[in-house]
Amino acid sequence: MKATLLLLCLACSALAAPPTKKQPEPAKPLPPLEKATIAIDGHPESVAADAEGNIYFTCIGAKLAPTEKDKDGYLGVIPHGSTEPKKITDVDTLDAPKGLLYQDGFLYCTDVDMVYKIDAKTGTIEGYVDLSPSRMKFLNDLAFINGRLMVSSTDTDQIFYVDTNTSSYGELVTKQPIYKPNGLAWDPERKVIYLCEYATDEKGKPSGRLLSINPVSREVTELSKERGQYDGLVYRDNALYYSDWSKDKKPEAIRRLDLKTGRSAPAATGPIEGAADFIPVSYTHLRAHETLRHL
């Protein structure tokens, strides 16, 4: 089975008028998206890029089973200048890889209850961390936070520091609870972690929040009164870009929150289906991918 990988270019233009103190007014939508789709075998989840413009992606597998250890998943690459995806990892290597990062020739990915460090050219596993003793089944996003690799555990409401060189890990215990943590990002100026939640309340209504976490004090701060089922998260130029499954097939599926004004706006003028993860590809652009649109 195939799904499509959607590449989106989002203009990061500044927002205009300042907000009111009590209730920020909605900002104007950003310019239209430029997009192109590429067919992928299976269910793509996250994307990453290197300096040469190669686009890497994780694929959960032919069936959408993100918590099963079925050896059905893989890592792939779309070489720069090509529209033909290629598999990097061998069959029976990965189960359901989700979060993905590229750094210094290596790909870091989450896979159910594992975190792997994989050679981006050969697909060889160069290091790993086994988090199964903590009994999670849904390790999700990754981010380098102040030089340390961190991962979100969506099903256990936790965030972990991991070290693929020593195969060790530890939990970042926050002072206030977090629920269904998903996307992670680091703000090097403010020295805070950004987090979005994929959560619902007892009635099934979207209740996920956009948060900042001080890694030293462990204090959690809400950034917006908006609620959703958030997935991908990127910090860029004093703004957060985030995807929302509760707004699937709408322009609001991807939004931009200006951290200076507190105002948010749709990052698209047309409907977007299945938007999940994002990657920055230049100073003024982002790329995102669309998952679960079957051919």
PLM regions: where:
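Residue position within the beta-strands of beta-propeller blades
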Residues: 56-58, 109, 151, 195, ...
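Conserved small/polar residues in nucleotide/adenosyl-binding loops
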Residues: 284-294
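Short loop/turn segments that connect beta-strands within beta-propeller blades
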Residues: 79-82, 119-123, 163-167, 214-217, ...
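A short loop-to-beta-strand structural motif that recurs across blades of beta-propeller domains
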Residues: 73-76, 114-116, 158-160, 209-211, ...
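A short beta-strand motif characteristic of beta-propeller blades
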Residues: 33-37, 84-90, 126-131, 168-174, ...
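Beta-strand-rich domains and repeat architectures in extracellular enzymes and scaffolds
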Residues: 37-65, 69-71
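Short, solvent-exposed loop/turn segments at conserved positions within beta-propeller repeat blades
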Residues: 66-71, 154-155, 201-207, 247-251
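Beta-rich, blade/repeat-based domains predominating
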Residues: 41-52, 91-104, 133-150, 177-192, ...
